Amino acid sequence: MNLRINIFYTTCGSPKQSKKLAKAMLSDKMIVCVNVVKNVESYYRDSGSLKKSNESILLIKTFHTKKKIENLIKKNHPYDIPFLVQLETKKVNSEYILWARKNT
């Protein structure tokens, strides 16, 4: 049995946006689960000046490929240019994999 699952990391500007994006992904049965970490401070440079934003982090668990998740994120994400990265996993416990496959 393949004990791998894909994990993607992205951010949203508000808990409301995060909830909407999570529901869209779950409704499409594209993901197993999404963890939302609220109230993260992000610092960055935009248009030549320093910015600070409060964001939520989304950790997305799925069996789908980056291309499929990327298309779904682009379609539903509130940002014009969302950040999305795939985190490599080595081995996930088999009980979780069985549960995840049964529920997606």
How would you describe each model-predicted region?
Residues 1-104:
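Positively charged, small/polar-rich N-terminal and surface patches that mediate targeting and assembly
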